[in-house]
C-alpha cells in the first residue's frame, strides 16, 4: 500500500489531519519529527543546538529514506523536508505527496 505524505508549513495541520486520515483509513500515522526524536533520543532543538542544521538535515534525510520503505502509513513531514530533492524523490517512490496550504492567520 502506498503512503500518504503530508507536507506544508509549520502549523498547517499536517499532524492533526494526518492522524484523522490514518484513523479513517486504517493506516499507521508517523510524524517525522517524532520519528527523529525517538530515533536520536533528543529533541529537535537539542540536535540543532549541539550539531547544527546541516547534521539535523542529514538525520532527517536518513529517516525519510527509512520511512519511504514502509507502506500503509500517513506521514506528516517536517517543514524543511521539501527543501531536499532526494527526500521528495524517496517519499514519492512509495507515496502520494500532498501539500497542505493555509492562510497566514491560521
Residue ranges and their predicted role:
Residues 6:
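Hydrophobic anchor at the beta1->P-loop junction of P-loop NTPases
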Residues 11:
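Walker A (P-loop) phosphate-binding loop of P-loop NTPases
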Residues 15:
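Walker A/P-loop
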Residues 32-92:
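ATP-dependent small-molecule kinase phosphotransfer cores
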Residues 91-106:
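Conserved phosphate-donor/acceptor-positioning beta-strand/loop module used by diverse small-molecule
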Amino acid at each position: 500500500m502506498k503512503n500518504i505524505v503530508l507536507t506544508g508549513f509549520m502549523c498547517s495541520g499536517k499532524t492533526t489531519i494526518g492522524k484523522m486520515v490514518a484513523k479513517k483509513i486504517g493506516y499507521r500515522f508517523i510524524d517525522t519529527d517524532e520519528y527523529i526524536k525517538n530515533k536520536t533520543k533528543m529533541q529537535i532543538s537539542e540536535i540543532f543546538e549541539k550539531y547544527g542544521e546541516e547534521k539535523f538535515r542529514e538525520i532527517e534525510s536518513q529517516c525519510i529514506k527509512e520511512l519511504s520503505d514502509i507502506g500503509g502509513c500517513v506521514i506528516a513531514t517536517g517543514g524543511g523536508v521539501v527543501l531536499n530533492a532526494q527526500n521528495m524523490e524517496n517519499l514519492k517512490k512509495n507515496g502520494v505527496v500532498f501539500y497542505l496550504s493555509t492562510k497566514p492567520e491560521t
